[in-house]
């Protein structure tokens, strides 16, 4: 088993996807798509370390330009900025964890969202997914 891991960091529950490169059916390579707490992600990575080829971490902090035009009110903007900053910190900590554990990883700039319908057209995953989980899964398939 050779795994690619996708992570969409979040303070409460990060999107997590595990993709097995050795499965013959390309449309059926996801072995896990779910939401995990920060600590559960660390445990999963540590336990599966010997199988992991690379961890792809969604790194929104690499995007220099932000668009606040659609958000009204300074208080709302401040709350959104704080939440985004906290999520970015989780991503940075996960990258540091991979570094410390000797797990190969790459920081990936997010490219956009995909619908559940579109995601399921790409693979044979039948379970429910939320946006964070789909974002994590799309990191490992390079979209």
Question: Which residues are covered by each model-predicted region?
Answer:
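Phosphate- and other anionic-substrate recognition elements at nucleic-acid/protein interfaces
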Residues: 2-143
């Amino acid at each position: 088993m050779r795994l690619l891991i996708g992570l969409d960091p979040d303070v409460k529950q990060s999107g997590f996807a595990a993709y097995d490169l050795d499965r013959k059916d390309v449309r059926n390579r996801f072995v896990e798509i779910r939401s995990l707490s920060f600590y559960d992600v660390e445990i999963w990575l540590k336990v599966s370390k010997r199988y992991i080829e690379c961890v792809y971490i969604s790194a929104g902090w690499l995007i220099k330009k932000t668009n606040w035009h659609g958000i009204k009110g300074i208080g709302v903007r401040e709350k959104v900025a704080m939440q985004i900053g906290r999520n970015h910190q989780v991503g940075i900590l996960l990258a540091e964890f991979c570094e410390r554990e000797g797990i190969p990883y790459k920081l990936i700039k997010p490219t956009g969202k995909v619908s559940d319908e579109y995601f399921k057209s790409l693979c044979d995953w039948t379970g429910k997914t939320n946006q964070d989980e789909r974002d994590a899964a799309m990191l490992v398939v390079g979209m």
